[in-house]
Structures are given as structure tokens and as C-alpha cells.
Amino acid sequence: MNQEITNDEARERYEDIAHELAATHSDVELRKLFSMPAIYVKGKACAGFTQGKEMVFKLTGAAHAEALGLEGAHLFDPGGMDRPMKEWVVVPAAHAAEWPRLAELALAYVAGR
């Protein structure tokens, strides 16, 4: 379901997801990636929150294709130099309802679960 939310609401949703993952997975840490808040598992980044109202997820296979198929989603290009990180998908806040599930999928992928 698409819905418009504010920057503060988007950040709060990211924080809820990040803290829930950290509370339920002992190998999850909350750190920075490219100056943005990020979720790490086993020392590797799996998701983050951009300066805008977007979350980024490291995904593969069907999960990657599904996320990339969401309206407004695109590959993550942190430097804006047309060199996207191919496994990373930016998902706008209009799809914030999908963020928790995508975060779990990203965590599982990066952790090798």
C-alpha cells in the first residue's frame, strides 16, 4: 500500500526497524554507511536510511527484483556518479509498509542465512 509520510515519520519507521532487528538478532549492529544510519549484520551492511525518505537494502534474486519493481525504487548510487551499487535497492517511503520485510530479507542475505 502506497502512502505519503513525512521525513520524521520515515526516520522513525527506520529507527523502529533498526532497533527491532538489533533487539532480536545478537549479530546486528547499528552504525554508519556513507554518513547515513545503517544496519550491519556480522560486520557487513545490509540496510540503511538516506537523507531523504528512503531506505536502502542489499538484496539478491527475487527479493531484489521485487524491490526494484516498486514504484520509485532504483539502484543505490551513493556518489551520484552514475555508478550504482548493483545489489542495493533504494525503496521510497511510499512503500514503508514493505521496509520491515525487506530489511529481514536483506539481513538474511548478508548474514548467509
Mark where each language-model region is.
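Charge-dense, helix-prone N-terminal extensions
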Residues: 1-113
